[in-house]
Amino acid sequence: MNTSEHVGGAAVASGRLMDALNNNGVKAKMLVMNKESDNITVVGLSGRFRKQLHFLWERWCIFCHLHFHRDHLFEIDIANAGTDITRLREFKEADVIHLAWINQGFISLKGIKKILKSGKPVVWTMHDLWPATGICHYTRGCMAFKNVCQNCRLLPGDGSNNDLSTKIFKRKQELFRRSGIHFVSCSKWLGDQARQSALLTGMGLDVIPNPIDTKLYHPISKHEARLHSMLPEDKRIILFVSQRVTHERKGMPFFIDAINKLVALHPEMKDNTAVAILGSHSDEITGQLSLQSYPLGYVTNELEIISIYNSADVYVLPSLEDNLPNTIMEAMACGVPSVAFKTGGIPEMIDHQKNGYLAKYRDADDLAAGIHWALDEADKDAVAQNCLRKVSANYSQRTVAMKYIEVYNQAAAFKNYKI
């Protein structure tokens, strides 16, 4: 179960996991708030007005707690509204219930309680830290969740000793107690963070990466890719990808700074290198870069996205906090090295100067050095092969599906219910 079918990293990862399971002997369906495709294995909720009401009610409650300021309005989730999915035929037929990213009015804490009362085994994949904190998805260094969330930085005046984060934390604590939920983290980094939470004390937690379909994401001719993507054949391409490229957490200011510093050191790049930016608001960035730029906008067609990755010589993701970015996995599956900050789950993906470059955290100079390494110093063929080997060994559909099947059996055994 995931709020969205396509939008966001958790949606993409959940859809890929469903495909991986179906391709490896498990009959899996994905429940979403709003179905956007004609995929028969995806089920959408009915009741458009009710769904909108759930979404708006949660946002309104958060807005009130923010003293009617929009700051952090979509960084907070309290799960006080959602649909009771236990009445659905698909729920009744299921042997295991698998939660993913279920916020923004999709499933409430009360709804999760009903799921648990059904007696069915529950697995919950964490795509961020929200299941292990009070109200936030990324903690930005705050470690209050180790004991109890309070004095939350996302709330006006840094909250209080009994603020909204405290109340939701305690509701989760009561919900999780003796629940038997089996948690899965997509990265070791996130798993290590989550295990420190007082909410998850004594709970099962495994680390399983997201899968990728290597029959779909694979290297193709750069000439063909650039023709399809309408990108220049006579230049090296630096690629940046994000759902919304101006999102603070994705580190666009560091990308701009690194590119401009690199061009100042190597002015010849103005003639032989360009930047492609994939994601919404990409046209807002081009005027800030010293290189010719191609704003590609928000693209949903997967074949177009694959062509764009294959057009690139290097992929750059200066995220300030990230779990296990799908975009790095996608670039690697196409044989394209990634340059990123050493943070979150990214070091589990990038082997420094083998399949990419790990730059010092928040260091635009080292980010620039990484781009230069990928473009001018690395053995491109060897790096591309290392990328493909990494993906094949760790993120293939079969590898990931087998690990999840083991988790499902563990969760079912805990409920004395073997699948």
Residue ranges of model-derived segments:
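Conserved acidic donor-binding segment of nucleotide-sugar-dependent glycosyltransferases
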Residues: 352-353, 357-364, 373-378
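Short alpha-helical donor nucleotide-sugar binding micro-motif in glycosyltransferases
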Residues: 307-312
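A short, active-site helix/loop in glycosyltransferases that binds the activated sugar's phosphate group
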Residues: 133-138, 159-205, 212-216, 222
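A short, well-ordered alpha-helix in the C-terminal region of glycosyltransferases
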Residues: 366, 379-394, 400-406
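Nucleotide-activated donor-binding/catalytic signature segment of Leloir-type glycosyltransferases, i.e.
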Residues: 266-273, 279-306
